[in-house]
Amino acid sequence: MSTKPFYRDTWAEIDLSAIKENVSNMKKHIGEHVHLMAVVKANAYGHGDAETAKAALDAGASCLAVAILDEAISLRKKGLKAPILVLGAVPPEYVAIAAEYDVTLTGYSVEWLQEAARHTKKGSLHFHLKVDTGMNRLGVKTEEEVQNVMAILDRNPRLKCKGVFTHFATADEKERGYFLMQFERFKELIAPLPLKNLMVHCANSAAGLRLKKGFFNAVRFGIGMYGLRPSADMSDEIPFQLRPAFTLHSTLSHVKLIRKGESVSYGAEYTAEKDTWIGTVPVGYADGWLRKLKGTDILVKGKRLKIAGRICMDQFMVELDQEYPPGTKVTLIGRQGDEYISMDEIAGRLETINYEVACTISSRVPRMFLENGSIMEVRNPLLQVNISN
């Protein structure tokens, strides 16, 4: 029986060396005594959760963060032993499950903590207190709520507060007024807490890269870990070169010559102005290569060539400058020769952010993990295979 990891020549390459380099540089930037929390939610922003987590931990991260309890349990089942914080809301009836898997939750309201205490019948629940300083998503907002939290902890010794944090709404923007307001508000709200015994974190990638101090004792490193800028506004403020880890590739599955006046793809929106070589690429919007990318450049033999016509669910066509043999490599995100298509370029075409592009590339696209140019592992959820070297 074949052990080939995938049977369609479309794949993403994840450079674990790049992730390690970004983590190592960030650790040097924030200082040896500040914890680096590697954010690997949403399958590590589409890069591969367990593989990214292991690389980050090897490079100096001391703990992990995810968005939902399911992600944390998945990491535990894949063998990750490092501390894991769930940043999002977990219904209090599941706190025993979190404790079973040694997962730290976010306590985000007085009511949640009261219910969590009711459901913690044995053992203890570890949590970080979320403080809302202006994001208005999750968290306690007032000094009174903080005092109520402390009272709940006094009455419920099974509840163990291990950290406190907030999240900035505008840390990646040029205008710093709102960001600085949140920073000051955070310091005010946490003042009554026993901070000496807590992990205190407010800086995300944007704030962590921008700030020279004020990290408290932990920084959450998300988008920057993957070598992506938090925003274009920060281009001149990043203290070291971020190295992108994600590239996306396919091949020409079919090449044909169409005559002047013939059309391509649904809606017949593309019509050849002259006899033209057309290549078919087995990538479509079901893979996360969205229809709005019609007319976008891709790379073939180091040249920028444009997608012809509408993108289909599973395939798209490209206008070629000459005949190429089927099997010719195509790069959608990444480098060929002197040409480079960045995640930011694709985000610009989609009028969105690079975070969304990375998360949109679906699990139907196998991830190939490389280190120092060598393939270390290939993960294909469709075939439920992980092949390691």
Swiss-Prot record:
GO terms for cellular component: cytosol. GO terms for molecular function: alanine racemase activity; pyridoxal phosphate binding. It comes from Bacillus subtilis (strain 168). This is Alanine racemase 1. Pathway: Amino-acid biosynthesis; D-alanine biosynthesis; D-alanine from L-alanine: step 1/1. Keywords: Isomerase, Pyridoxal phosphate. Substrate binds at residues 137, 313. It comes from the Bacteria. The keyword Cell cycle does not apply. Its cofactor is pyridoxal 5'-phosphate. PANTHER family: ALANINE RACEMASE (PTHR30511), ALANINE RACEMASE, CATABOLIC-RELATED (PTHR30511:SF0). The gene is alr1. Belongs to the alanine racemase family. It is an enzyme of class 5 (isomerase). It catalyses: L-alanine = D-alanine. SUPFAM superfamilies: Alanine racemase C-terminal domain-like, PLP-binding barrel. SMART domains: Ala_racemase_C. The modification N6-(pyridoxal phosphate)lysine is found at residue 41. Its EC number is 5.1.1.1. Catalyzes the interconversion of L-alanine and D-alanine. May also act on other amino acids. The keyword Amino-acid biosynthesis does not apply. The active site is at 41 (proton acceptor), 266 (proton acceptor). One of its GO terms (biological process) is D-alanine biosynthetic process.
